[in-house]
Amino acid sequence: MKASELREKSVEELNAELLGLLREQFNLRMQHATGQLTQTHQLKLVRRNIARVKTIITSKAGA
């Protein structure tokens, strides 16, 4: 997801997005641990999306 799309969302929507990404990250970590995950780059993408959402939440809280 692009940062410009995230900036248009409200803080509540961003928190919901963050929760979904954290759940997805957990599921991917479990799949990776059991050897079921073949596309390991998904972990990196989800981690970066979490960072994007957290950054925008912080910037909106300070504004």
UniProtKB/Swiss-Prot annotation:
It comes from the Bacteria. The keyword Ribonucleoprotein applies. InterPro entries: Ribosomal_protein_uL29, Ribosomal_uL29, Ribosomal_uL29_CS, Ribosomal_uL29_sf. GO terms for biological process: translation. Keywords: Ribonucleoprotein, Ribosomal protein. It holds the Pfam family Ribosomal_L29. GO terms for cellular component: cytosolic large ribosomal subunit. GO terms for molecular function: structural constituent of ribosome. Belongs to the universal ribosomal protein uL29 family. HAMAP family: Ribosomal_uL29 (MF_00374). This is Large ribosomal subunit protein uL29. The gene is rpmC.
